[in-house]
């Protein structure tokens, strides 16, 4: 058994030039958890996500995935859904599936095709012809069809209708293994709150708290959504 945390940030600082983005961030994320990474715009959420993915390097401090620093060898551990569309509208859905199949050795194309079928998405249509909701669902399907140990989802339900949000949350729950963890960054806290095991609150590049979601609700006698609104009502 691997004795290391799934994700470990050790006193991480990140500057963009002279501007600090993260200040002395330490995090310990264990397997089998769904974690909400919550904070106002510009708080440092996306910087943390990119550091874990190895897309940025810390100014100081250390980041480990199962005891190893982010590298090409750790790419199979993490499946990442960015907050912007990364697939060409001119490509067909089936081409996106084949791209993931060729690029990731832990991608389950059978699962992806079945999920697309469940949505009645024709794999031969071009991505640009899909509705916004179906496009976001398709991207999530691709990410969740990898047998990864950590799924990082940046605003996975932003800009879609409530019915689409429900589908996306169910897809997240049903397509992870009990030992895989999910980090969700979103502003739509009320929608994701029911599935969260843990909450990380961040502001101005600093971690304010990292706690069990149920314990937070009991401690403050309010929902995570209300706690967030009260904490950041002036931001």
Language model features by range: what are they?
Residues 38-40:
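The feature captures the beta-strand-to-loop junction immediately N-terminal to the Walker
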Residues 53:
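Helix-to-loop junction immediately C-terminal to a conserved catalytic motif
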Residues 60-74:
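Conserved ABC transporter NBD signature motif
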Residues 83-139:
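ABC-family P-loop ATPase nucleotide-binding domains
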Residues 151-155:
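Catalytic Walker B motif of ABC-type/P-loop ATPase nucleotide-binding domains
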Residues 210-211:
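ABC ATPase "signature
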